[in-house]
């Protein structure tokens, strides 16, 4: 096929890294990859091993209201997002956001890992799921001020600064099957 760019999804790149090395790994013209799910701990090794120059990582979900795109080729990031979002402190043991004394969420500092939430606005709506109860369970209210609402993505990301983020981990759902989180 002589392709120079390919797409990837999820753990595909990790599976390739776990495979035994082969002489075929650089016998291609592929210099760019676009997709989602490239783990930061394999990013550089993957590029070196397979001869990839650019990885254009994306972040989005069909039900969500926040997306990122790595159009500037910053290694180890999902890029930046033009939509309103926040990265908040999250207690993994309690499986819940961390709240301040006034009952509001606390944003992480640059370099810290937290829960990615997308602000629900007229221009950035949350279309949600077909199940109204599931919708209620993923909407956080009064996050920073009375009356605001955010979509809980269920994903941990690192705040890189410059409105860039790095995907770290998914909290609950492990994979999608026929368009549904399983």
Question: Locations of the language-model features?
Answer:
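Gly/Ser/Thr-rich phosphate-binding loop
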Residues: 1-9, 17-90, 105, 125-126
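Intrinsically disordered, low-complexity regions enriched in small/polar residues
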Residues: 10, 61, 87, 92, ...
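Aromatic/His-enriched, Gly/Pro-containing loop or helix-boundary segments
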Residues: 13
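Short secondary-structure boundary micro-motifs
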Residues: 40, 70-71, 100, 139-142, ...
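Mobile, glycine-enriched helix-loop/loop "lid" segments at the mouths of ligand-binding/catalytic clefts
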Residues: 77-99, 127-130, 134-140
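Conserved ATP-binding/catalytic segment of the ANL
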Residues: 104-181
């Amino acid at each position: 096929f002589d392709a120079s760019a390919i797409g990837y999804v999820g753990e595909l790149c990790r599976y390739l890294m776990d495979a035994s090395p082969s002489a075929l790994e650089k016998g291609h013209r592929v210099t760019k990859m676009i997709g989602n799910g490239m783990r930061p701990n394999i990013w550089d090794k993957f590029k070196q091993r397979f001869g990839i120059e650019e990885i254009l990582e994306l972040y989005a979900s069909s039900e969500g209201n926040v997306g990122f795109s790595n159009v500037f080729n910053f290694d180890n990031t999902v890029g930046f997002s033009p939509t309103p979002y926040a990265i908040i402190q999250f207690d993994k043991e309690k499986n819940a956001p961390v709240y301040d004394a006034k009952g509001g969420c606390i944003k992480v500092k640059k370099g810290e890992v937290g829960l990615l939430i997308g602000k629900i606005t007229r221009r950035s709506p949350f279309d949600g799921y077909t199940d109204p109860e599931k919708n209620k369970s993923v909407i956080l209210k009064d996050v920073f001020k009375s009356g605001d609402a955010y979509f809980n993505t269920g994903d941990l990301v690192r705040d890189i600064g410059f409105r860039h983020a790095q995907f770290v981990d998914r909290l609950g759902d492990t994979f999608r099957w026929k368009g549904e989180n399983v």
